[in-house]
């Protein structure tokens, strides 16, 4: 399963080349939600796009991002103060009478202090690094869809919750960030041929076994060209009227170079000339949808151990 991916940096520039418009209203709604719910995870590279955007809607998004960063910094600074005090207390205790409990408290406090310092330094840096574009299940990413005949970029959660299911579906089916091709007319029949999307990514990541250990491999096209990964998406509405936009990346049997690493699935990059047809499927002609998946981009995937 594709458990993680790296979205295209400067994604707003890339998607503009596809003719898609950014749904600022949906992004503004998401960033407002993050202020109230810290579990909402958005890659920093997505935030960065709005530092370059213009207009009132983009300004409201920047304001929400700045507010969130201030809240996050305050939370970490308060926790850093607490851990420094814990470290000082443990060191005083060790000086008077060494105990395993005090030594363990000092060790834990030291680890947390290092982690918090790293997080604060990360929050304050200005440039982007590769990991700023990574998404994981439950994170939000920019996804291209077609609505009312126009391509739009909307932020969606990388774990699909189909319309009509209860909210606890996410816990009962935690693997719904991927949609197996051989299940498209089974589990995914409500979305396949109806609600298609593409996600612009640079590379993807997979868990593989190496002896008794699990390692993460990073796969990227040898030509370093971005991919438009085939996805399914859903607009879920809860009993209280709340809305969730979410998606799953379609996976298929891997090419030989991916299979040789020990992994049995791979994402499907759509050819640019098929994007419009993919985003506007005919539910009565699933054969055409499968034909697009078959006539995919077939780059050679290089791999390395993920950092």
Describe each PLM feature range:
Residues 1-307:
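Short linear sequence motif anchored by a di-proline
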